[in-house]
């Protein structure tokens, strides 16, 4: 049962970050959000690491060490996202996705370590 949960969480998070990474490169909304965050120069870098993390999580289904590294990296990335949201005084509703994905990837990390 835990294996199916882990697989679902990895695929869900991996696909989510592939989408987020793509949007960082091509979405006007995301471009404007990074301007609002005060870090417009980090948009493409963030998109790259989100895409890399998403791909690595999915490949990590077969190469577990890669999933462990990706889940740690994405957890850190989302913690940084929470910090940015706090810095610009975004409300809880706008901060919740970053909190959710930070916890999700921390859980994925935990599940791989305790397999």
Regions flagged by a language model, labelled:
Residues 2-115:
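Membrane-interface extramembranous regions
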């Amino acid at each position: 049962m835990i294996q199916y949960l882990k697989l679902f969480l990895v695929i869900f998070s991996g696909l989510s970050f592939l989408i987020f990474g793509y949007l960082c490169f091509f979405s006007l909304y995301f471009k404007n959000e990074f301007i609002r965050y005060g870090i417009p120069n980090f948009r493409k870098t963030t998109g790259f690491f989100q895409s890399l993390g998403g791909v690595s999580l999915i490949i990590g289904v077969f190469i577990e060490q890669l999933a462990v590294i990706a889940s740690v990296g994405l957890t850190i990335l989302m913690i940084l996202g929470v910090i940015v949201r706090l810095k610009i005084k975004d409300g809880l509703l706008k901060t919740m996705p970053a909190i959710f994905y930070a916890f999700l990837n921390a859980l994925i990390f935990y599940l791989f370590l305790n397999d």
